[in-house]
Amino acid sequence: MSDKIRLLEGKVSSVAMDKTVVVRAERYVKHPLYGKFVKKTTKYYVHDEKNECKEGDVIKFKETRPYSKTKKWCLVDIINREK
């Protein structure tokens, strides 16, 4: 396994579950044939122990041990709070 810690940033899209937030992370991928950069979004389930995130916050999260079947990411820091 790699020693490099995977850190990602994304925007919180749902806080409906207890100690879990749903985060959408955007990335740009080059189309293989046409060469145009296309925006792709990926949905991550992130563990939020203190339930401190709100919908619309921009957060930083890292890969960690599996908390459940789908939740393998943990909250590191809240970068920008939604007002």
UniProtKB/Swiss-Prot annotation:
Keyword Phosphoprotein: no
GO molecular function: rRNA binding; structural constituent of ribosome
Cited Pfam families: Ribosomal_S17 (PF00366)
InterPro entries assigned: NA-bd_OB-fold, Ribosomal_uS17, Ribosomal_uS17_bact/chlr
Keywords annotated in UniProt: Ribonucleoprotein, Ribosomal protein, RNA-binding, rRNA-binding
Entries under SUPFAM superfamilies matching the protein: Nucleic acid-binding proteins
GO biological process: translation
GO annotations of cellular component type: cytosolic small ribosomal subunit
Assembly, per entry: Part of the 30S ribosomal subunit.
Function according to Swiss-Prot or TrEMBL: One of the primary rRNA binding proteins, it binds specifically to the 5'-end of 16S ribosomal RNA.
Family the UniProt entry places it in: Belongs to the universal ribosomal protein uS17 family.
Protein name: Small ribosomal subunit protein uS17
Organism: Francisella philomiragia subsp. philomiragia (strain ATCC 25017 / CCUG 19701 / FSC 153 / O#319-036)
Species classification: Bacteria, Pseudomonadati, Pseudomonadota, Gammaproteobacteria, Thiotrichales
Gene behind the chain: rpsQ
